[in-house]
Regions:
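Secretory targeting signals
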Residues: 3-54, 74-155, 159, 193-200
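Intrinsic structural disorder
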Residues: 1, 38, 48, 56, ...
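Membrane-helix interface linkers and caps
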Residues: 55, 61-62
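Terminal transmembrane helical anchor/hairpin motif
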Residues: 105-133, 160-232
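Hydrophobic/aromatic residues in alpha-helical transmembrane segments
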Residues: 43-47, 59, 148, 210-211, ...
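Hydrophobic/aromatic positions within or immediately flanking transmembrane alpha-helices
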Residues: 61, 74, 162-163
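Long, hydrophobic, well-ordered secondary-structure blocks that form the structural core
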Residues: 62-63, 83
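Short helix-to-coil transition segments within interhelical loops
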Residues: 64-70
Length: 232
């Protein structure tokens, strides 16, 4: 109560709010990793089949503009992956958001985080701001995961093998990080939402670059193999 009075004197619209309500929505280690791991699992199951019709049709030509290339088809399939990602992300996160509002009401979303956490520097940053930043960060990470699965799919040309490799590369690391308290988007958002966004963007860009390099190496390998066969 004394803290709320202090905040009120500073011109902050202080409110009582159950800390558990906020933690259950954006700062719950269990819910964060469970939801994101479930989303990644859905991606691992669905994304490999986007390119599967091309595994036996010179799929590697899809990723470069050559005389035999199919750039339009490649980017069309990328759009399909993005739509699949958006549907999966919405289906997983929106229902929880709706349940939260139905249970606690929308007013609690406007509560400044300084009413809950004393170490928050920006007094205007509210629960809804934290929720939005949290969702943006997870969507960027999910996009990066989609790039990883696509790269594995291009490299292996096998849906089932892609699922196995993607599980090792994505799902298992998530399970390994589960017990580390500070490795959570919600933790970063509370301490510095700018750092959370920047770090997530950098990680996503890095993964995208690695994906493109994998496709480049695979294309070069295939081109060399075809030249050798042509000479033979």
């Amino acid at each position: 109560y004394n803290r709320l009075l202090e905040l009120d004197k500073k011109g902050i619209d202080a409110k009582f709010i159950d800390e558990n309500i906020y933690k259950s929505f954006v700062s719950s280690k269990t819910r964060e990793w469970n939801d994101f791991a479930l989303l990644c699992l859905v991606l691992v199951i669905g994304v490999p089949y986007v390119f599967s019709p091309e595994y036996k049709n010179g799929m590697i030509n899809l990723i470069r503009t050559t005389e035999n290339g199919k750039t339009k088809l490649f980017f069309g399939k990328i759009v399909v992956e993005c739509i699949y990602l958006l549907i999966a992300f919405t289906a997983l996160y929106v229902p929880y958001f709706v349940r939260f509002i139905n249970t606690y009401g929308a007013n609690s979303l406007n509560t400044p985080l300084v009413c809950i956490f004393e170490n928050v520097q920006e007094t205007s940053f509210s629960v809804i701001n934290a929720v939005v930043v949290n969702l943006i960060c997870y969507f960027l990470l999910a996009t990066a995961v989609t790039f990883v699965i696509t790269a594995v799919s291009i490299f292996t040309r096998s849906s089932m093998f892609t699922m196995v490799v993607s599980t090792v590369l994505v799902i298992l690391p998530l399970l390994a990080l589960y017990s580390i308290e500070n490795v959570r988007i919600g933790y970063w958002v509370v301490n510095s939402h700018i750092i959370a966004i920047v770090m997530t963007c950098l990680l996503s860009i890095l993964i995208a670059i690695v994906t493109l390099e994998i496709s480049k190496l695979k294309f070069t390998e295939t081109r060399i193999w075809r030249r050798i066969n042509a000479k033979a």
